[in-house]
Amino acid sequence: MGGGGDSRIPRLLREQFVGTDLRCIVRTYDFDPEIGHAQIASWVEELRPDLVIGESLGAIQALRVRGIPHLFVSPSLGAPDFLVRLAWVCKVPGGKALLHRIWHVKEGDRQPLRFEYEIMKKYGPHWADAKKAAAEGGYYYAFFGTHDHYRKSGVVKVSLWEELFGKTYTIYDGTHFMEEEYVYALLIPKIHEILDGPADVLPGECFFQIIVLQ
């Protein structure tokens, strides 16, 4: 939510994968979940990624990508319900401005947030479609921070993750925004574990594409 190409995790992954057979792709998609889903589906068809990483609210869009392994950082599975319940604020004078002050997007290659009643209400069926896609099976693994401030509000729910995917997660001693040390110590090794290619493939002969959704 409000992330993009110059966010921490995409930047670190791109830097780490320079000169390797891994390519990290980040594209900013629309805050309207249905427009965003259509954009992402088009990119997946174009790029044929080998792995999708969903961070924060981007986890819901990532769940709707079928047929490839999934990794998640601080998946905000409770966010759709939160946004639906908060939609009424958009109808109050000054409500939209208040939401933009609370969730201020940094300058740069970031997702513009559009707090509109109709858009926020769409997150209900968006979450239903994500759960339906996840129920079809696949590889799902998540990382949660012990000091994630969104866990108090229920936006991030480890218990809900367990309900859907079991104990397929690691909890690190950090925040919602995975610190650099854990990107190197946890996320990147897990990426290599999933995308461990054939030993006889020479460097430069094969590239693995990773798409990051935030």
Task: Name the predicted role of every residue range.
Residues 1, 53, 143-145:
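Short hydrophobic segments within beta-strands
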Residues 1-46:
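Active-site catalytic motif of lipid deacylating hydrolases and related acyltransferases
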Residues 53-58, 62:
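Gly/Ala-rich beta-loop-alpha elbow adjacent to hydrolase catalytic centers
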Residues 65:
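Aromatic pocket-lining residues of Rossmann-like dinucleotide-binding sites
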Residues 69-198:
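The alpha/beta-hydrolase serine catalytic core
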